[in-house]
Amino acid sequence: MQILDKINKENISDAFALSMTKFFRFTADTFFAKRYGHRAVVLETVAGVPGMVAGVWMHFKSLRAMKAGYGEQIREMLAEAENERMHLMFFIEIAKPNIFERLLVTSAQIVFGLFYLFMYVFFTRTAHRMIGYFEDEAVKSYTEYLELVESGKVTNIDAPDLCLLYTSPSPRDP
């Protein structure tokens, strides 16, 4: 069962989070259509933002409170952002985005980064809910992509060397 099916969408926070998710999904679907590799580049660009925002915000919270104790949470959030960065690197090798798409990635990072920072600082619950919806949409999008690969409609290429290096039993920092 998907996240969207489990959540009460009656309150304004959930409704806003869901509407933003649908807006971003519509925008990605319209712009990229069935170019799943290129869509994944932008999705992974955006996916790295929440972990970085949360990690940095917790870091500042620790500094403001002048207390230790946030270290593990900070490391987990930043590790999640790093993991998403690596996913982006894999899809860049697969999709080979052109200069326009690279500019789009930069724009998406700036716009979504500022938007998510605002949401996280002032409406934390809604920000978390929105990311839950994003993850659900990512599962749908990647499932569609996988089905196309398995059906032969999209070429199944070898994993990039960077991917193999990163996922090896003793990964090195690429």
Regions found by a protein language model. Give the residues of each.
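Active-site-proximal alpha-helical scaffolds that flank and shape metal-associated catalytic sites
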Residues: 75-150, 158-161
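Terminal targeting/low-complexity segments that flank the catalytic cores of oxidoreductases
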Residues: 1-69, 152-164
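Residue-level signal for functionally critical sites in structured catalytic/ligand-binding pockets
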Residues: 44, 48-62, 66, 83-87, ...
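Single conserved hydrophobic/aromatic residue that forms the stacking wall/gate
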Residues: 166-174
